Amino acid sequence: MNCEELTNKLTNFVLSKVGEANAKGVVLGLSGGIDSSLVATICVKALGKDNVLGVIMPEKNSNTQDKEHAELLANQLGIKYTVSDITDVLKSFGAGGYIPTKEFDKMADGNLKPRIRMCILYYFANKNNLLVAGTSNKSEIYMGYGTKYGDLGSDFLLIGNLFKTEVRELSKYLGVPDEIINKAPSAGLWEGQTDEKELGITYELLDKVLMAIEQNKEKEDISKELTVPIEKIEEILNRIESNKHKSQPIPIPN
């Protein structure tokens, strides 16, 4: 991967999208993770620090280290940022785990968090004539590891064509802090949650499988080449198929 060439391509993409929309810049959610850190870094490179706004959106169960890392990144880049705690919004919905009478529901309550955050980002976007820069990567998009009208809701997905392992490589090249690059990836949807635990496979291995699928290799060959059980390959293929709707336009009858 040619990091210099890729950086130029992505910065030009940001400039193009912002220019087409006659926007003043971009706003993005800063989670303290590698994806949002890389997107913020590239946007600053493209637009300058004064045209990038970061929004940190923790809630009462968020890992405090994530907020620290988000602020570390914002300060390193010199961008303005605001902190918008979503705990009270979750309570107003009656979300499980936020009021005493309800248990946390991973599907309903877990997905509510990124949807609230999307609304906040678009508020700041509309208020300041900014575009919302999405932070989902190619591995997540393939696996449907994102919330429809939540973190997948944005004006563009800058790293949507980069696998997670490529995100790591480019982040190192562009100077994203090591403590952000090296920590376990997590969507932060519930306490102790990590991407790889939930996906049941490391990103390093998953990306190799996804690249092989892109090359139209047979599942038996992928299993043999990567020493991955055929059942796991089938599980990944099924997950890709069942989550395609998250990346497709809303269905309209003919």
Curated annotation (Swiss-Prot):
It comes from the Archaea. ATP binds at residues 29-36, 135, 164, 186. Mg(2+) binds at residues 35, 140. Homodimer. Deamido-NAD(+) binds at residues 115, 148, 155, 245-246. Pathway: Cofactor biosynthesis; NAD(+) biosynthesis; NAD(+) from deamido-NAD(+) (ammonia route): step 1/1. GO terms for biological process: NAD biosynthetic process. The keyword Nucleotide-binding applies. Catalyzes the ATP-dependent amidation of deamido-NAD to form NAD. Uses ammonia as a nitrogen source. One of its GO terms (cellular component) is cytoplasm. Belongs to the NAD synthetase family. This is NH(3)-dependent NAD(+) synthetase. Pfam families: NAD_synthase. GO terms for molecular function: ATP binding; glutaminase activity; metal ion binding; NAD+ synthase (glutamine-hydrolyzing) activity; NAD+ synthase activity. The keyword Magnesium applies. It catalyses: deamido-NAD(+) + NH4(+) + ATP = AMP + diphosphate + NAD(+) + H(+). Keywords: ATP-binding, Ligase, Magnesium, Metal-binding, NAD, Nucleotide-binding. Its EC number is 6.3.1.5.
